[in-house]
Amino acid sequence: MNDFWQHCSALLERELTPQQYVTWIKPLAPVAFDASANTLSIAAPNRFKLDWVKSQFSGRIADLAREFWNTPIEVQFVLDPKAGMRGAPAGVAPAAPRMPLTPNGPAAAVAAIAANLTAHASAAPSAPADVPLTPSAAAAHHLHGDDADIDLPSLPAHEAAAGRRTWRPGPGAAPANGAEADSMYERSKLNPVLTFDNFVTGKANQLARAAAIQVAHNPGISYNPLFLYGGVGLGKTHLIHAIGNQLLLDKAGARIRYIHAEQYVSDVVKAYQRKAFDDFKRYYHSLDLLLIDDIQFFSGKSRTQEEFFYAFEALVANKAQVIITSDTYPKEISGIDDRLISRFDSGLTVAIEPPELEMRVAILMRKAQSEGVNLSEDVAFFVAKHLRSNVRELEGALRKILAYSKFHGREISIELTKEALKDLLTVQNRQISVENIQKTVADFYNIKVADMYSKKRPANIARPRQIAMYLAKELTQKSLPEIGELFGGRDHTTVLHAVRKIADERGKDAQLNHELHVLEQTLKG
């Protein structure tokens, strides 16, 4: 095991930049090798490094292990705080660095962030890293008994004095270790794996992604706030983490915080109980970027809404960026103060729709590739055709397929996929029917269901009928002729015209897009 790790470390040191090697590989340590099960366990000193190494380097380490032992090896990663103190195994000779395997990839990006952080730290060497907290802040940070902490990272001295941080990006020497990067992500609560590079883009989310990139490069200037809405599992959280990660790359030292709305509510309650609102406000009002997820959880919580309103006003006044996500359009969120709704509407509001077929296929293929599995296109198309709601559902289905294949020792095929997803496919087929779509659309537009089959052509009937045809094509497995038959025996070309017309207008008409979003969410329950 140790011989392999020396061999593996030496090769990775040649393949990676010195910064990448020191930050990600050197802190790892092999802890166990089970020859009977062909498993190798590698320890990482913290969760951040474990998640990053697992996502970025596990495939390469597994390849090297297979070459070394001449058999497939399953590489497992475990947490061990002492791993970072072990360093690289003795006897590993220094190697001349080569160009990184992925110079523009996420690992290189974090290395660049860490380098910028060192430059930022060296710009003010006399300032201490942290200052003692006030008594109320100490109460907020160090609680005992059943109470959890108010999740407010401490402010560096020069930030506490100035009220908010000044960005000081710039090149610098690589740090001796990844401690700065660890601290940066711990404070921001960002997931470094969620980047623009691994966000699968299609028609359903291309506007949201374009807006997110614009905001990431020009925070506080364009689209403030940026409000993203859509159903669960469509990529809202991925996008806002990607914005934060990109801003850290562009402007090292930016004060960023990702927080779920439920955690924000909890922090408000605890600050109220401990009379620690001064510290609470000082922290949230001094951010450069606030990313708040699922703001619909603020519904009915007046004190939380009041505190968020003050934070929002302070941040926008300071040209800090605010990004918000929700499961629905701002004006559709119940129990939210009108003045907050008006602030949400003052920026850019963008919907993220369920992924279209091609995008679903791309998501499945990329996820399978990240799992080291060669998924055939016919299997990917089969799954994508039957599962339409969101990315999480697709990824969950793929995990079921992979597990079923492994447990039964069979190659992945369409037949195996049907067996693995039998229950899921049955539920999907039972949930949405053309008849249900017709009734839902008729109720929504206040027309009779019989109008769906009739030959009437006034606009107030023809338009909902076209929308129902479009939804039938998108949400069921019916063919165009079958859909036409269910709409009063219409020709398949009529259905095709309706589908193309609504699909085209959806991308141009915000009101139509919103109505379709509401209908889709209603039909999917």
Curated annotation (Swiss-Prot):
- One Gene Ontology CC term in the entry: plasma membrane
Keyword list (alphabetical) reads: ATP-binding, Cytoplasm, DNA replication, DNA-binding, Lipid-binding, Nucleotide-binding
The coiled-coil regions, if any, are: none
Q: Where is this region: Domain III, AAA+ region?
A: 189-405
InterPro entries from the UniProt entry? AAA+_ATPase, Chromosome_initiator_DnaA, Chromosome_initiator_DnaA-like, Chromosome_initiator_DnaA_CS, DnaA_C, DnaA_dom, DnaA_N_dom, DnaA_N_sf
Q: Choose any GO biological process term that the UniProt entry carries and state it.
A: regulation of DNA replication
Quaternary structure, per UniProt, is: Oligomerizes as a right-handed, spiral filament on DNA at oriC.
Domain commentary: Domain I is involved in oligomerization and binding regulators, domain II is flexibile and of varying length in different bacteria, domain III forms the AAA+ region, while domain IV binds dsDNA.
What this protein is called in its record is Chromosomal replication initiator protein DnaA
Species per Swiss-Prot/TrEMBL record = Burkholderia vietnamiensis (strain G4 / LMG 22486)
